[in-house]
């Protein structure tokens, strides 16, 4: 028996509600309603900069993952060498949050499955801790995939996504970037 390993084409990513002005599971720190901060590119960039990808790879995934800056790993057809993961930069993230009008942050729930991807719930918990460092009071709610995906895709009003900030995974069936 010969054992080998290598990167898969599965990428774990965060889906952020950028379209609804009033997004569920996002409030001011006091719990009052606010305009959806995820609509602001500076907030989304701040979130990306607050993620310590090296820590997720080494501690949560115990070295069996690689950082990704796009939806496929290096070496796959259609992957750009110019798209790198954002650095871990909490100081810059805090500045972007302030520039976007959220110097004190806001509250948000991270939703994800707890039985679909390797260490999915642990990744969500690690992300919450990282977001808390830049002023986003993030809580985590995970659930079995049979419940999660239905609610994530059409569990809200008018069959809209029920969640605002979701942990998801994606892999190209053909191993190239244009594959759905």
What are the language-model segments listed below?
Residues 1-60, 66, 76-180:
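Extracytoplasmic/periplasmic ligand-capture domains
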Residues 65-66, 71:
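Short, surface-exposed glycine/acidic/tryptophan-bearing loops
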């Amino acid at each position: 028996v010969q054992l080998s390993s290598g990167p898969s084409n599965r990428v774990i990513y965060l889906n952020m509600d950028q379209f609804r002005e009033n997004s569920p599971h996002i409030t001011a720190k006091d719990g009052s309603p606010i305009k959806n901060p995820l609509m602001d590119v500076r907030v989304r960039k701040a979130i990306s900069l607050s993620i310590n990808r090296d820590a997720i790879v080494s501690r949560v995934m115990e070295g069996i993952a690689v950082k990704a800056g796009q939806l496929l790993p290096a070496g796959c057809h259609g992957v750009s060498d110019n798209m790198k993961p954002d650095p871990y930069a909490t100081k810059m993230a805090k500045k972007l949050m302030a520039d976007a009008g959220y110097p004190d942050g806001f509250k948000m729930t991270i939703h994800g499955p707890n039985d679909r991807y390797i260490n999915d719930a642990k990744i969500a918990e690690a992300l919450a801790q990282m977001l808390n460092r830049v002023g986003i009071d993030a809580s985590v709610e995970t659930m079995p995939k049979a419940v999660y995906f239905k609610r994530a895709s059409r569990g809200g009003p008018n069959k809209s996504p029920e969640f605002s900030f979701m942990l998801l995974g994606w892999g190209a069936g053909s191993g190239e970037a244009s594959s759905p």
